[in-house]
């Protein structure tokens, strides 16, 4: 007990000493820092975040403006909450904000920064980005695997059509669909047997692992902001991360070892390509791939490429159930282009203008990543007359930017018409060029899988609109549907969407 007491007193004394020294020798900057709430001693503004940081920082922006400074423990943090401020960071000063700050999630779950998402900006990151751009996300690669996405969406449609009177947890089946579509491209096979969440018990387990990773990764870990407390793991976050990483690593190691030594035909999957690149110089500067980097890349693709798309589609269907006139108009458009004797195909999407507006409006109101992944200032800079110190962490409140009343009329309403000709934002896109809505980020660290994500989300939403009418479980009124958010790295629904799908096409459309 005496040793523990000595350790505790030493920690408290070191905190007080550091706080006094920091207060006494406060840095002098050539310009003022951005405004923000007054920090508490030691913990700073961590106390102001609450359980949903995207909402709390959006509320702060109403008081302090769209560029805020927060002191999170001993870490300088700046928050951008408007399109113009976001453009300053990710367009004008993009090169200065292209790396990630140290964080426990990258250390414990992303193979110690050896993945694409958290790797420092440099040769290794460029190598991983190039591999994804060429072999998975290029236009040719997306076109080559179009049939895979359509097959898995058709499997999803059959599963929903066969539900009968049984209520369906839509999010789980959507996750199975997106995971199998990505797995067939990456691994050459499905992860979940026949694509039915009811049949394969792995589906629920995998979904829970992905959601748990997103929730844990979205926690503001005190140890990241007060390094002296890191070893205590006060919130138990590091322990959860390590256990979750062990489960994912076992899953990915089995896949990798099973794949080695296989002989592939002309159409290789991504993993076989990655394995072959281990023996080549994948990039002039980047060097060769390692098994750890391959597993880290697979982890990125499985987590970021499945849960984000499925949660976006779940939000879209919830909004359409609450807005039956919008649903009916979308069905009318698709019926006119596709008919009722077959399912929507990817090549039909270019003709579906109203559907595209629905997808954009869903990305606006329900961005899968409400707070951007953090970036770090490599050097000090000036933004809008304020000083941004070197080493500051940058957070973009994507959720607040897309709900800014100065940029959007009736920002809380689901109104796809705003993106149509004659609407308020007919030319605004979601691909990182228009900062009013940036669900995939922008600049050098924009989401590598953006084009795949857009294609998959459009196809799934179009198919679900076209193939089914939607009823809530008995007693629920559409206007009373709970639209509360559950915060994590991705924006989940607080209550999973439980529905009765009612087929509306000719029977032959669901066969085959």
Curated annotation (Swiss-Prot):
What species does this protein belong to? Petunia hybrida
Alphabetized, the UniProt keywords read: Endoplasmic reticulum, Flavonoid biosynthesis, Heme, Iron, Membrane, Metal-binding, Monooxygenase, NADP, Oxidoreductase, Transmembrane, Transmembrane helix
Q: Which residues lie on this side of the membrane: Cytoplasmic?
A: 22-512
List this protein's GO terms for biological process: flavonoid biosynthetic process
Q: Which gene specifies this protein's sequence?
A: CYP75B2
- Cofactor entry: heme
Q: What is its EC number?
A: 1.14.14.82
Q: What is this protein called?
A: Flavonoid 3'-monooxygenase
Described function? Catalyzes the 3'-hydroxylation of the flavonoid B-ring to the 3',4'-hydroxylated state. Convert naringenin to eriodictyol and dihydrokaempferol to dihydroquercetin.
Recorded GO terms, molecular function? flavonoid 3'-monooxygenase activity; heme binding; iron ion binding
Q: Which residues are listed as membrane-spanning?
A: 1-21
